[in-house]
Amino acid sequence: MNGGAERAMRSLPSLGGLALLCCAAAAAASTASAGNVTGGGGAEGQVVPSPSPGLRDQASSPFPKTAAPTAQAPRTGPPRTTVRKTGATTPSAGSPEIIPPLRTSAQPAATPFPALDLSPATPSEDGHTPTTESPPSRPAPTTLASTVGQPPTTSVVTTAQASSTPGTPTAESPDRSSNSSGVPPTAPVTEAPTSPPPEHMCNCSEVGSLDVKRCNQTTGQCDCHVGYQGLHCDTCKEGFYLNHTVGLCLPCHCSPHGAVSILCNSSGNCQCKVGVTGSMCDKCQDGHYGFGKTGCLPCQCNNRSDSCDVHTGACLNCQENSKGEHCEECKEGFYPSPDAAKQCHRCPCSAVTSTGNCTIESGELEPTCDQCKDGYTGQNCNKCENGYYNSDSICTQCECHGHVDPIKTPKICKPESGECINCLHNTTGFWCEKCLEGYVRDLQRNCIKQEVIVPTPEGSTILVSNASLTTSVPTPVINSTFAPTTLQTIFAVSSSENSTSALADVSWTQFNIIILTVIIIVVVLLMGFVGAVYMYREYQNRKLNAPFWTIELKEDNISFSSYHDSIPNADVSGLLEDDANEVAPNGQLTLTTPIHNYKA
């Protein structure tokens, strides 16, 4: 019996008190065996008696009470009582001591003893005994009231001892001191063994886990690296993919703006929105621009280009003769059609007559050339302007030498030929290059009237224009001898002036004719000379062309042939010394003498 029990026993005044105490302990043990035995968490069983309300109202016991044990699930089978103790030895520390069960004979109690405070406790893992209240379904233990009228001064606490090894039941033998007192010990009760908690095999991935040997012993969950998931950290998280080259889970890095989700395939390619491309969906496809929160926008090129700048959206490589940021304009030299299609057509403007560009106004069907060159006019710059005429489809300026008034005659010259119209300043001719009859050019190239000095009968002179001289005849004066002389002089001057004017008019034409005649004569003479030389050479060739003969020796004759066709019947009699040889009709000579008699 431990020290606490011994002190309690010594406090009893007599052996009768000891007997009454034994009876009370036996009654308490009998009550505990009736249904107050509980198992503690698979580690040890404990007796949980619940004190009656009467005992709770009594004065406190000199022994320190332990806290109520933690509620445990009831065991199946016959109830057993196990008495255990904790590692503590002093009551002041709150650790219970071993009190072996006492078996006594059933004796009716004359007077009730003070109620025993039976507070079994289950030790916790740290060595202290936690307390718990008994379940309400369990009956309260039997208490014995004292026969004496004095309040009790002591109480007996039944405790349980925690085994040295959790979960291993041990049988305690009764204390020898109890045997010396004559109380038989209670048979030891052993607790049924309980199964230990299951231990999980971690089996963590060497690549995906932080530690292959460390995991949660309850769930088996391993500690994973970033990007790995699963019980064993053997799969990739969302937003990661397994790179088969390195065998690791790598992040997808899908763009939140261009990708449909954060997921990617086994190659690391994200699923892109419409108009977005790239393995991470972070750039625009051809034909799209403006990568942003909504993805990419299609290029606005009026169906004239398939590509544009990925940042600004400016169209590139505009087709169909168009230009502009969105291919909405026509190139230089083209104009948009008046219909809804707005197709670009070439301007009907020649680059020779205009700048080549044109415009079309709203509501018009034909374009107008922007700017015509000098000398051209019209909607398409295909007409000659006033003061110009058409010379081989080119507008050439009229050459009237300033003798046509452009105000009175805007055209100045005829558009089809260039002949000047309404020559002024006493001029005439195709280009107004001649002076009228009776006019001559002065030093400034102006046509002025020609004047001559005419003597009068009084001995004075007067200035008379050439025109008046040719049209008027002076009246004979008193001096008849002077009159013929005067008339002769006047007419002589007039005739000389007229001849000079006529010579000036005809000289250029005659000069041209003379030059042409000389050229023709020279050409004819050269042709005659060449023909004469050719005839002479032919004659010499015919004269010197002698016949050439070839002689072929055969067995009994000599054959010859001429290489000149102009002598078909040449005389070959001189080829042989013997004149008696006859010439065969076929050109063969018959030999009448031995072969050594002729000469080659």
UniProtKB/Swiss-Prot annotation:
Record CDD domains: EGF_Lam (cd00055)
Q: Which ranges make up the Extracellular topological domains here? A: 35-512
Q: Which N-terminal stretch is annotated as signal sequence? A: 1-34
Q: How does it sit in the bilayer?
A: Single-pass type I membrane protein
- Gene Ontology CC, one term: basement membrane
Identify the coding gene: Megf9
- Look up keyword Membrane and say if it applies: yes
Composition bias (Polar residues) maps to: 167-182
- Outline which residue ranges sit on the Cytoplasmic face: 534-600
Q: Name one Pfam family in it.
A: EGF_LMN_ATRN
Q: Which residues are glycosylated?
A: N36, N179, N203, N216, N243, N265, N303, N357, N426, N466, N479, N498
Q: Where is the Laminin EGF-like domain?
A: 202-251, 252-298, 299-346, 347-397, 398-449
Q: In its UniProt entry, what is this protein called?
A: Multiple epidermal growth factor-like domains protein 9
The transmembrane segments are 513-533
This protein's source sits in the domain of life called Eukaryota
